[in-house]
Amino acid sequence: MARVCDVTGKKPMVGNNVSHANNKTKRRFLPNLQYRRFWVESENRWVRLRVSSAALRLIDKNGIDSVLADLRARGQA
């Protein structure tokens, strides 16, 4: 299963671990993804999404109905 946010599309980034001696080794920065259930009043049901913490703030700001409408317009839900 891909580590991708359902709402924002955030994915893992690639960077470096840097030691005290300035040696660099590749690493992945993973997004902070959580499975959350959202109650959709208009559909009278729960919707389960894998969202980042940034997406949670976006849902708090715009509302779950608006976010789901955007997802459906993109063909992702």
Swiss-Prot record:
Keywords attached to this Swiss-Prot or TrEMBL record, sorted alphabetically, are: Ribonucleoprotein, Ribosomal protein
Q: What Pfam families does this protein map onto?
A: Ribosomal_L28 (PF00830)
Its domain of life reads Bacteria
Q: Which GO terms describe its biological process?
A: translation
GO cellular component terms, alphabetically, are: cytosolic large ribosomal subunit
Q: Which InterPro entries match?
A: Ribosomal_bL28 (IPR026569), Ribosomal_bL28/bL31-like_sf (IPR034704), Ribosomal_bL28_bact-type (IPR001383), Ribosomal_bL28_sf (IPR037147)
Q: State a single Gene Ontology molecular function.
A: structural constituent of ribosome
Q: Which PANTHER family match?
A: 39S RIBOSOMAL PROTEIN L28, MITOCHONDRIAL (PTHR13528), LARGE RIBOSOMAL SUBUNIT PROTEIN BL28M (PTHR13528:SF2)
Instruction: Report the sequence similarity comment from the record.
Output: Belongs to the bacterial ribosomal protein bL28 family.
Provide the protein name: Large ribosomal subunit protein bL28
> According to the entry, what is the taxonomic lineage of the organism?
Bacteria, Pseudomonadati, Pseudomonadota, Betaproteobacteria, Burkholderiales
